[in-house]
Swiss-Prot record:
InterPro entries: Clx_II_MBL, Glyoxalase_II_hydrolase, HAGH_C, Hydroxyacylglutathione_Hdrlase, Metallo-B-lactamas, RibonucZ/Hydroxyglut_hydro
The keyword Hydrolase belongs to this UniProt entry's keyword annotation: yes
Function field: Thiolesterase that catalyzes the hydrolysis of S-D-lactoyl-glutathione to form glutathione and D-lactic acid.
Identification of the protein by name: Hydroxyacylglutathione hydrolase
Signal sequence annotation: none
Source organism of this protein record: Shewanella baltica (strain OS195)
Free-text remark on how the cofactor is bound: Binds 2 Zn(2+) ions per subunit.
Ligand binding (Zn(2+) 1): H55, H57, H117, D134
Hydrolase as UniProt keyword: yes
One of the GO BP terms on file: methylglyoxal catabolic process to D-lactate via S-lactoyl-glutathione
Top-rank lineage group of the source organism: Bacteria
Enzyme class: hydrolase
Binding positions for Zn(2+) 2 per the UniProt entry: D59, H60, D134, H172
One MF annotation (Gene Ontology) recorded for this entry: hydroxyacylglutathione hydrolase activity
Length: 263
């Protein structure tokens, strides 16, 4: 049985731990902070054998060197082949190596190229779990630091086509702020209203809203629904000079991202 556990880091990051019971060897996804990972390993008598990286930002990679030293340079470190990240031992690209396996973990991992947040961002799928870094958030998506709106929309559409039951393990607890924006653009979405209430209740108990699911994100995430009639109407109302424009999905997505950046 594959168990996935969150380690909290910084203000809102999640570092994901993958463990196939009954093994005590584990992998971590996007360890921006080595100290919290080491504390978790030692508290649970686990051995770190590998790291999975989604992109180059320091809050996702900052702990790699220290973890390598802690593990006496015995780690396998997977990450995107076209981003400059120190410590990667196994560079990955979905076209060249769409699938691979991990020691101590059952089943194959699928690699997805999901540029947008960064130029070389990748995601991982194993069984019913998606590790998508800063591409897809619950109720939102990542800022476009290096990619184009077209790239990000294509990446999100690729993720949205995964099976509905797929659990979404993103890297940040941004859900409440994302849902506040989502409700501003899609206020009559009953599924969104219900989810917002559940998310508020979880956060009041200091519980994570993650993982989400692909099914839920299809229903409530405005960045997966940029052509929805109400969302298009909200965009045109917000950008009043476009009130008579014909917006395709890319145009709507581009304006949604611009709106969210200044929300």
């Amino acid at each position: 049985m594959l168990t996935i556990t969150a380690i909290k880091a910084f203000n809102d990051n999640y570092i994901w731990v993958l463990q196939q019971q009954p093994h005590t060897q584990v992998y971590v996804v996007d360890p921006g902070d080595a100290s919290v990972v080491i504390d978790y390993l030692e508290a649970n008598q686990l051995t770190l054998v590998g790291i999975l990286l989604t992109h180059h930002h320091n809050d996702h990679t900052g702990g790699v060197a220290e973890l390598q030293a802690y593990s006496q340079d015995r780690l396998t470190v997977y990450g995107p082949d076209n981003e400059k990240i120190e410590g990667i031992t196994h560079p990955l690209h979905a076209t060249a190596q769409p699938r691979f396996t991990l020691d101590y973990i059952s089943g194959e991992l699928q690699v997805l190229d999901v540029p947008g947040h960064t130029a070389g961002h990748i995601a991982y799928v194993i069984a019913d779990a998606l590790f998508c870094g800063d591409t897809l958030f619950s109720g939102g998506c990542g800022r476009l630091f290096e990619g184009t709106p077209a790239q990000m929309l294509n990446s999100l559409q690729q993720l949205a086509q995964l099976p509905a039951y797929t659990r979404v393990y993103c890297a940040h607890e941004y859900t409440l702020s994302n849902l506040k924006f989502a409700l501003a653009v899609n206020p009559n979405n009953c599924a969104l209203q219900d989810y917002n209430e559940r998310a508020i209740a979880l956060r009041r108990q200091d519980k994570a809203t993650i993982p989400s699911t692909i099914a839920l994100e299809r229903a409530i995430n405005p960045f997966l629904r940029a052509s929805d009639t109400e969302i298009v109407g909200s965009i045109k109302q917000h950008f009043s000079d476009l009130s008579h424009a014909n917006l395709d999905e890319l145009g709507g997505f581009t304006l949604l991202r611009q709106w969210k950046d200044n929300f």
